[in-house]
Amino acid sequence: MSKLRVAVLGARGRIGSEAVRAVEAADDLELVAALGRGDRLETLTDTGAQAVVELTTPASVMENLDFCLRHGIHAVVGTTGWTDERLAQLNTWLDDSPSTGVLIAPNFSIGAVLTMKFAERAARYFESVEVVELHHPNKVDAPSGTATRTAQLIAAARAEAGSAPQPDATTTALDGARGADVDGVPVHAIRLRGLLAHQEVLLGGEGETLTIRHDSLHHSSFMPGILLGVRRVVTTPGLTFGLEHFLDLN
């Protein structure tokens, strides 16, 4: 059986370089291009890439995906900064390339994805819930895409269950003291030297609390999810948001 031809965009970054090694080590994949800033996107078509792993920046991702979709190249995207407007534009491009698949994953760690699903399942049973994400100080966005996605899943689960608004008697606070409000769920971001990527979901009810925590200790923790995404996206046309849809959790 022929190998799937894969390219990595953002190949010189920490996660990108790890992804290059992971693709090279996979028996069923062939690394055909490893592109960094300034490299020609035409290399993707020159090398016959069938799928890309997109790990660049919010400033570059739309141009890269536009090129990929115009040439029928599937994409697994870890780049953050997604807005409703950007997603709408991406769906417009996908309408013109209906057989092409795009996976956008706020987190490629399977443990982190499971943490999100556990929190979603638990949220309806507790009166209060808050999210704390902890990352290295070089991370440019806050809160993280994972924390935002977690809060959105929690909020949707609570709305479906008819949960009351969370109790909070705070009337005065310094700016940011109660975190960011994501659909009614407080999200707190910590940036600290020595950390990589960590998240806690704190749930509280009458006389008890539950803490759901995940820790990524090395960039290698993202590789099984990236490889799963590459293998599944080529048979999943359209936009898939969240790696959980490829884990058959339901």
From Swiss-Prot:
GO terms for cellular component: cytosol. NAD(+) binds at residues 10-15, 78-80, 105-108. One of its GO terms (molecular function) is NADP binding. One of its GO terms (biological process) is lysine biosynthetic process via diaminopimelate. The keyword Ligase does not apply. Its EC number is 1.17.1.8. It catalyses: (S)-2,3,4,5-tetrahydrodipicolinate + NAD(+) + H2O = (2S,4S)-4-hydroxy-2,3,4,5-tetrahydrodipicolinate + NADH + H(+); (S)-2,3,4,5-tetrahydrodipicolinate + NADP(+) + H2O = (2S,4S)-4-hydroxy-2,3,4,5-tetrahydrodipicolinate + NADPH + H(+). It is an enzyme of class 1 (oxidoreductase). Keywords: Amino-acid biosynthesis, Cytoplasm, Diaminopimelate biosynthesis, Lysine biosynthesis, NAD, NADP, Oxidoreductase. Pfam families: DapB_C (PF05173), DapB_N (PF01113). (S)-2,3,4,5-tetrahydrodipicolinate binds at residues 136, 145-146. It is found in: Cytoplasm. PANTHER family: 4-HYDROXY-TETRAHYDRODIPICOLINATE REDUCTASE 1, CHLOROPLASTIC-RELATED, DIHYDRODIPICOLINATE REDUCTASE. HAMAP family: DapB. Belongs to the DapB family. This is 4-hydroxy-tetrahydrodipicolinate reductase.
